[in-house]
Amino acid sequence: MAAKIYDAIVIGGGHAGVEAAFILSKKNFNVALISLNQNRLASMPCNPSIGGPAKGIITREIDALGGKQAYFADQAMIQIKMLNTSKGPAVRAIRAQIDKEKYSQIILKAVQETKNIDLIEDMVFEIQTKDNKISGVITEKNGLLETKTAIITAGTYLDSYILRGEEKYSSGPDGEKTSNSLSNSLIKLGFKLLRLKTGTPPRIYANSIDFSEVEEEILPESNLNFSIYHSKKLSKQIHCYLTYTSEKTHQIILDNINKSSMYSGLIKGIGPRYCPSVEDKIVRFKDKERHQIFFEPETIKADIMYINGLSTSMPIDVQDQMIKSINGLKNAKVAKYAYAIEYDAIDPLQLKKSLESKEIENLFFAGQINGTSGYEEAAGQGLLAGINASLKLENREALNLKRSDSYIGVLIDDLTTKGTKEPYRMLTSRAEYRLLLRNDNADIRLLKYAKYAKTLTDKEIATTEAKYDLITKKIAELENQYISINDPLAKKYNLANSTSFLQLISRHEIDIKEIVGNFPFLEELSTNVRLDGYIKKQLSQADKMLRLENLKLPEDLNYDNVVNLAFEARQKLKMIKPLTIGQASRISGINPADIQMLMFHLNLKVVKNEN
């Protein structure tokens, strides 16, 4: 009997891996999902939360493209809130505390119930290729598994080490297995690897915390949820708590700074800029008297608290001193000590914007192995890699999201155009067109891509189209309805002339609900009307950039033949091989003069071809 050949093998069962597997199975491809531990699918070894600034919008985008993170987050959330409500709509985003145990359990159940996903608990030793094309993987228990495509989503498990003080040992997150052989296999295939570092804070037993010494964050009931297509509301909000480091905490850290794995030189990997360890914060910001520490429940039982803000690589004895110096933690009992973890990642400049390898056909990469941090960034990449693997199997063009379309598009463009030397975290400030990339419009702006990729059901498509039609018709209706000067509203709002309802609600002091009533998409209607001028300006800017994106660069372009290119520009262009003039213009070290020379060369080439 012939051995089974999979349509796709997904290596790694983290947030990227499960998204890739689910979207491929949704498109009726047979998938092998290989995980070191099936009981830790999409585990949360760091913060037990989904969302946050920019990141919450990525989760909404995943939902809009047919992915699963939003749906699963809604099933396992224990607290949810909208962030930045006092600011403009461009920066608002949802964040939810997640029951991390339930999250993994419901994903495992969903995988097991999906007929065309084979969940295999194993370790991949080697990537097999034939004629620079993926052909299979060699595993520890199952030997050779053949495949047409593969997606590597190995997270922080490649040649990973846990570090505390002078202690250093080979391990994956939370004491899981590490994979050394896969790193070696990638090196043999010619991939350049990066060495990165991240970390996680201690966990404390809740019954050992003195909650009378900390501030309780009490949130009102909420009807928020992540998923656009599957509504589930939270019945009860579980509370988080706020406290601060003390002067004593800072002194303990400074007195023992050389014992930190990071400051002793033991850690060689580069850590995340936007999620520093507590010792890094205290060394860098010596004038700051205290730093925020949040107690966040890891499950609905709330018996263990994640100590957000106390990430460290100090030895255990110093951690004990640090913990007990913080208000509320004088008698704390530690469930798990903090640690740093160092691991291999690939240089993402080796990838196309589809997340396919430039050198090995049908081999894709997604998640933290691409140099990112965060569950949301990983899931977004996993979804896109899965979609593009499916399109490759269908002999169709890859789906490449633009910077003006989505945060996922910004993320992938940054990775594949600029690369990264540290764990990349998505920030609102990274998006030039953030007013277009809002929390409330992910479904509408990504609908055309979901239709192309065939990742939504007919019902989901109809839901989004109905929403768009309803908003469009309401705006037209408001534009054509006028308030006469004798109307009570005219007197209430001091209107001297007949005014359209659209003009009236464009004024920020007006209660829009008074005018339109219980309109189901009030926030999006308000934003579209009140920020119409700003939105049009960003659309115009995006359109100008799109013109450059439409100027394609030949894949076989010989940059050595382009005259007057700066040496650095020539090197970068040869290495990155941008697909368009727009992408080339965003490469670090490429200046406008280089772009002009490139365009001049292409124009000359076109003329010569025509003659």
Curated annotation (Swiss-Prot):
One of its GO terms (biological process) is tRNA wobble uridine modification. Pfam families: GIDA (PF01134), SAM_GIDA_C (PF13932). The keyword Membrane does not apply. Its main location: cytoplasm. Keywords: Cytoplasm, FAD, Flavoprotein, NAD, tRNA processing. One of its GO terms (molecular function) is flavin adenine dinucleotide binding. NAD(+) binds at residues 271-285. GO terms for cellular component: cytosol. Its cofactor is FAD. The keyword NAD applies. FAD binds at residues 12-17, 124, 179, 368. It is found in: Cytoplasm. Homodimer. Heterotetramer of two MnmE and two MnmG subunits. NAD-binding protein involved in the addition of a carboxymethylaminomethyl (cmnm) group at the wobble position (U34) of certain tRNAs, forming tRNA-cmnm(5)s(2)U34. Belongs to the MnmG family. This is tRNA uridine 5-carboxymethylaminomethyl modification enzyme MnmG. It comes from Mycoplasma mobile (strain ATCC 43663 / 163K / NCTC 11711) (Mesomycoplasma mobile). The lineage of its organism: Bacteria, Bacillati, Mycoplasmatota, Mycoplasmoidales, Metamycoplasmataceae.
